[in-house]
Amino acid sequence: MANSDSGDKEAHRSSKHGGWITLPFMLVTLLGMSITYFGWVMNLIVFLIEEFNIKSIAAVQISNIVNGVVNMLPVVAAILADSFFGNIPVISASAFISLTGISLLTLIASLDYLRPRPCETGSILCQSPSKLQLGILYAALALVITGTAGTRFILASAGANQYKKPKEQGRFFNWYFFTLYGGAITGTTAIVYAQDNASWKLGFGLCVAANLISFIIFVAGKRLYEHDQPLGSPYTSLVRVLVAATMKRKAVISYKDEDYHHRELEKETKTYVAMPSKSFRFLNRAALKTEGDSNNNMWRLCSVQEVEDFKAVLRLVPLWTSVMFLSAPLAVQMSMTVLQAMVMDRKLGPHFKVSAGSMQVIALVSGCVFIILNNWTTYPMYQKLIRKPLTPLQKVGIGHVLTILSMAISAVVEAKRLKTVENSHLMSVLWLVPALVINGIGEAFHFPANIAIFYGEFPESLRNTATSLTSVVMGISFYLSTALIDVIQRTTKWLPNDINHGRVDNVYLVLVIIGVSNFGYFLVCSWFYKYRNLKNDDHEQDLKDVTN
């Protein structure tokens, strides 16, 4: 009877909180925050060059570092959400911090004394920004970076938590990615156009408006959300497994179920297992009952579920590193595309000139379109012909191939551009389009699939971390791209400040080599990887719904 009452209360609570009524609040928040983020970050290189008189390659490096930090910090936000505050308060606080940062950027664009004097036309010697000016700029960037990091990927977890069924979570992820790309496209076109053709003050001011609306809408829907309850740090259990296994490293591993420790509540979880798996067998000692063990000493005796959760994280590490080297070439291409566009003919007709920072919108539009096409046509047609769905890893593999192809096309186009420059002509910026389109198609395959893999395969207690892990991978990839550009600049003459006298085509060829090597590594990793949550047809269908 007590259990029945408890179930009724749970059902009543679920009917009042969460569900599809929360979708508009989540999506409007995501849309506004995406417009804000892409509105300032996509044109950051141009802003640093034109408004702070920073050299082109130095501006690229600063942009890569900024992108790295903004993609690394979500894991910190995820830890705060999982361990202490829950994801709803973290998103609210982060949206406000972002609003403070973008407001400060707007002030910098509005007040002349917060920027160095602009270079005179044709002048080589330009006034460098003062320490105070750089300090205020970096403070603004730090605030808006922190705010962005605590919203984008935590919103994915918070939104998915509003639904109980994997199929509904899958539909939410579709809306999430569509809205994310929609905000990115709006920020990269409308906001960047306003910055280049009206003023930086107007462009950043529009970002302030978008951020403010996001913050108000999200807070307004707070009473409707299903709030997750932080249960203390889930990372402690991972450390405890390692400590317990080390303490009992001399114990003989048993093959009997009764020799291993279980907790009653774990039997209700979807991933419950009676016996520890054979992989990473040395960790099984953490759950092995030995003389002197006490159920109260969790640093010496862990449960089988905790051991298997730790193994699940370890199994994903090779895939995690392969995604990292998949994203690094994309980060370099993103930066180089802006520099290339700045020295190309950007006129489309007699009155319209494309913004250099807006060129990346082509990849975003391509990705958005092909996410829809994949879900509506490509994946259903494949399943109809082959009689089984594309797995998430197969989708990531297709993304690898398309990324390599994109880099190869970029190399060919840049080689042609340099020959055109030798003849004192400007090549049309439209030559950059094919590589960017293929880049976007590749992202439509690998980006949602990676999110689905990490969300579906991570332990339930680390779900916020799971969705932010893709962002961390992207962050590390930006640092790798920064290191790669630095090495190339130090060891070759391919990347001078004036790329018309460089060999960016050779940089792209290096990226092709990295991509091919990483694809081989990915094939090996995916061959040995076994899905944790694809043990039967139902689970396979669930993850297919999340990915598609």
Swiss-Prot record:
CDD domains noted in UniProt: MFS_NPF1_2
Give the residue range of the signal peptide.
none
The record's annotation in PROSITE patterns points to: PTR2_1
In what way does this protein cross or attach to the membrane?
Answer: Multi-pass membrane protein
Single GO biological process annotation from the record: chloride transmembrane transport
Q: Where in the cell is it found?
A: Membrane
Query: What GO molecular function annotation could you give as one example from this UniProt entry?
Result: chloride transmembrane transporter activity
On the tree of life, the source organism's domain of life is: Eukaryota
Tissue specificity is:
Strongly expressed in the root stele.
Q: GO CC: one term?
A: plasma membrane
Q: What is its main location?
A: membrane
* This protein's UniProt keywords: Membrane, Nitrate assimilation, Transmembrane, Transmembrane helix, Transport
Locate the transmembrane regions by residue number.
29-49, 65-85, 88-108, 136-156, 172-192, 200-220, 316-336, 354-374, 393-413, 429-449, 468-488, 508-528
Task: Answer whether the UniProt record assigns the keyword Transmembrane to this protein.
Answer: yes
Any one Pfam family match given in the protein's UniProt record, by short name: PTR2
Family statement drawn from the similarity comment of this UniProt entry: Belongs to the major facilitator superfamily. Proton-dependent oligopeptide transporter (POT/PTR) (TC 2.A.17) family.
PANTHER family in the cross-refs: OLIGOPEPTIDE TRANSPORTER-RELATED (PTHR11654)
Sum up the protein's function in the record's words: Transporter involved in a passive nitrate efflux.
- Protein name in the entry: Protein NRT1/ PTR FAMILY 2.4
At the highest ranks, the source species' classification is: Eukaryota, Viridiplantae, Streptophyta, Embryophyta, Tracheophyta
